[in-house]
Amino acid sequence: MMKYLIFIFFLVLSGCGSTHKKPPAPAPAVQNVAPRQNTVQIPIDSWKYKIIDAATDEWIFFGQQKVIIEQDDESIPHVGAWEDDDWAHIERVNQYWRAVGMSKLSGKDCKEPWSAAFISWVMREAGVSASLFPPAPSHRDYLSHFLAVGQNPGAVFVPHTIQEYKPKPGDLICANRGAGYFGDVVEELPSSLNAKLHCDIVVQTDAGLLYAIGGNVRNSVSKSILKLSPDGFLQLTRHRPWFLVIENRLD
């Protein structure tokens, strides 16, 4: 089977209101989804596994779109379903918005970034209480909470810079977003946050690669594949200016 490869030079984490049109799908082929395996080597009854499982289910529902990030280049070897492709996916995005109290929005509202609503929904589906992970329509809201309480004894979501902590399955990785944004590596935790942020859920690390699932990534629930540094740390890239890792200490 020929590989279906599209190079993206200016990736914008936005909905279908962007100027990008959906690429044509590859020739139809029968796709067999492999049985779910515990590839992350964590207990299947743990909170982390439930979070990863919920995120993976949504990725499968949206057609398993993949985004490969290699230095400053990005590609989409497999295009999945987009937020406004059909009623099922339009309504699924509505379910994410309902998790943050915004029930009137759906996949048709293409200019409303829904990545934070997606993560809030995943946390709720996994059974994480709102007292531990406050649901929010904006990443800045829950990240500001973690920055304020993350150093308290017993904190379960603890922020780190990308230089001081190696991301693990169940963690969140966060980046600034917006056209043309590209800054230096953050050496200290910020005291305030940009309104335009994006976070993904780490689902696997293996052989120097990190796999993370997020909503509203190229108009879908996508799995991004990143190359870690030789020491296993997240690397800043032009299209993904990562600056923060939220360590998940839930058992």
Predicted regions and their residues:
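Large, modular interaction/toxin scaffolds in secreted and membrane-associated proteins
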Residues: 3, 19-20
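Low-complexity, Gly/Ser/Thr/Pro-rich intrinsically disordered linker/tail segments
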Residues: 216-251
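N-terminal capping segments
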Residues: 20-131
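Short hydrophobic/aromatic-rich beta-strand motifs
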Residues: 1-2, 173
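Short, solvent-exposed loop/turn and secondary-structure capping segments
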Residues: 66-70, 132-135, 185-186, 223-225
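Sec-dependent signal peptide recognition
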Residues: 2-8
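C-terminal motif of bacterial Sec signal peptides marking the signal peptidase cleavage site
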Residues: 12-15
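...with weaker cross-activation on analogous glycine-rich loops/strands in unrelated enzymes
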Residues: 135-218
